[in-house]
């Protein structure tokens, strides 16, 4: 999965997919009442990027739905996965459950069209703080109560705080999550970060008894760091330059080992070599 980083304006969806992304990451900011409000990152952000692009969250969802609904004039068949980077740092810990409920209602109405031929992309809810694990239960309970538990088949989870792998496993235990887990690791492209924890996550994924199904690394903008990430065995790389990742994947060393994921590839299934 080539994951376009910080795709917060509707116009950027096409821009990143046309550069080779089959997945996008979108920031979600919340208001004081834990309503998802804007797709907005803010300052500071990755070097070389504008940090200030935004939409109202519900408008973005509608644009995303158009891009991921077969038959729509805006349909992009390659776009199969969306990571919502949930900026819950602005919330009190006791608002996490409420944020999950409200997120579920927004997605149900504006993205999944109340279960009636909505967008088809898989969704990853990425949470920066392990203490905010109740967001997951708020989300899953609400979709079930609204009569659409089947949509949970489309949803996965990620804790993005680079916490110790064991601590992340405990948070999932508390949240009642037993699958659909992506594990992120990384840092802004302005700084360097080694692959120690990525390798640990990959080992957990491949052990057959870990909690991780997929591993992605961010933010990867250079050919050398792309090669390092692929060599470490990641499933996804998040990037500001999808075309760079595409170029590396076409190199002799990688083109027979890796291919771009399609809608037919289950993002919750651990890949067996």
From Swiss-Prot:
Note the Pfam families from the entry: GDPD_2 (PF13653)
* Tissue distribution: Expressed by the venom gland.
Q: Where does this one sit in the cell?
A: Secreted
Active site (catalytic residues):
5, 41
What cofactor requirement does the entry state?
Mg(2+)
Swiss-Prot/TrEMBL keywords: Cytolysis, Dermonecrotic toxin, Disulfide bond, Hemolysis, Lipid degradation, Lipid metabolism, Lyase, Magnesium, Metal-binding, Secreted, Toxin
> Which family does the entry's similarity section mention?
Belongs to the arthropod phospholipase D family. Class II subfamily.
Q: What is this protein called?
A: Dermonecrotic toxin LspaSicTox-alphaIA2iv
The species this protein belongs to is: Loxosceles spadicea (Recluse spider)
């Amino acid at each position: 999965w080539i994951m376009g980083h910080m795709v917060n304006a509707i116009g950027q969806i096409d821009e990143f997919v046309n550069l080779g992304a089959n997945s996008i990451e979108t920031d979600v900011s919340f208001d004081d009442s834990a309503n998802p409000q804007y797709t907005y990152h803010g300052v500071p952000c990755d070097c070389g990027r504008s940090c200030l692009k935004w939409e109202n969250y519900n408008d973005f969802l509608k644009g995303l739905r158009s891009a991921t609904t077969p038959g729509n004039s805006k349909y992009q068949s390659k776009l199969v996965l969306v990571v919502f980077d949930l900026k819950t740092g602005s919330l009190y810990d006791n608002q996490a459950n409420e944020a999950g409920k409200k997120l579920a209602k927004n997605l149900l109405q504006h993205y999944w069209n109340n279960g009636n031929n909505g967008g088809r992309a898989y969704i990853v809810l990425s949470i920066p703080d392990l203490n905010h694990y109740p967001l997951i239960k708020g989300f899953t309970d609400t979709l079930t109560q609204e009569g659409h538990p089947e949509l949970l088949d489309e949803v996965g989870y990620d804790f993005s705080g680079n916490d110790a792998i064991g601590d992340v496993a405990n948070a999932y235990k508390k949240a009642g999550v037993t699958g659909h887990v992506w594990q992120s690791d990384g840092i802004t492209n302005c700084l360097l970060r080694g692959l120690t924890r990525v390798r640990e996550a990959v080992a957990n994924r491949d052990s057959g008894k870990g909690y991780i199904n997929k591993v992605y690394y961010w933010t990867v903008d250079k050919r050398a760091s792309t090669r390092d990430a692929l060599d470490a065995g990641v499933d996804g790389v998040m990037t500001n330059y999808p075309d760079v990742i595409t170029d590396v994947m076409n190199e002799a060393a990688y083109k027979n080992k890796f291919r771009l994921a399609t809608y037919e590839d289950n993002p919750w299934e651990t890949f067996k070599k």
